[in-house]
Amino acid sequence: MKVLLTKEVKGLGKAGEIHEVKDGYGRNFLVGKGMAEIATNEVINRWKAEQKRRAEKEAQELERLKNVAKELASVTLKIVQKVGANGSLYGAITKEDLSAALMAQKGIEVDKKSFELKTPIKSTGIYEIEVKLGHGIHAELKIDVEGSNV
């Protein structure tokens, strides 16, 4: 019996591979536990179409992330925060603050987990922060932190 693996099966193969197995093993174990489907032409064609659709979606996402990285490289994000008498900020600027400011000022949505803050931003000045967008794509974001008196 030929089966198309839908999940990785130790000792047999990876998802998407077609293998010849004994009838009982294929029907009772692999198909019964949802690890494989009986490899008919319809199932194989459906699997290939699904893989093609996933690859196209992945390529679109990669292109979108590259465009976001280009936008971030050309953006200087301006954040105004309250400062005390000694010139330091009340509290630190967090990843959530950066994500919200980027969305509000530039309309670019970036997950707060993507920002790499090596040290907390607790004073005014210009900072460069690395943004890891996923799929190995990184961008540098300039942040201009200005203070406003209380």
Swiss-Prot record:
The yes or no answer to whether the keyword Ribosomal protein is present is: yes
Q: What does the entry list under GO cellular component? A: ribonucleoprotein complex; ribosome
Instruction: Reply yes or no: does the keyword RNA-binding apply.
Output: yes
Q: Which UniProt keywords apply?
A: Ribonucleoprotein, Ribosomal protein, RNA-binding, rRNA-binding
InterPro entries the record matches: Ribosomal_bL9 (IPR000244), Ribosomal_bL9/RNase_H1_N (IPR009027), Ribosomal_bL9_bac/chp (IPR020594), Ribosomal_bL9_C (IPR020069), Ribosomal_bL9_C_sf (IPR036791), Ribosomal_bL9_N (IPR020070), Ribosomal_bL9_N_sf (IPR036935)
One of the record's GO molecular function terms: structural constituent of ribosome
A Pfam family annotated for this chain is Ribosomal_L9_N
Q: What top-level branch of life does the organism fall under?
A: Bacteria
Give the UniProt record's GO annotations in the biological process aspect. translation
Under PANTHER family, the record lists: 50S RIBOSOMAL PROTEIN L9 (PTHR21368)
Similarity-based family:
Belongs to the bacterial ribosomal protein bL9 family.
- General function of this protein: Binds to the 23S rRNA.
* Name under which the protein is recorded: Large ribosomal subunit protein bL9
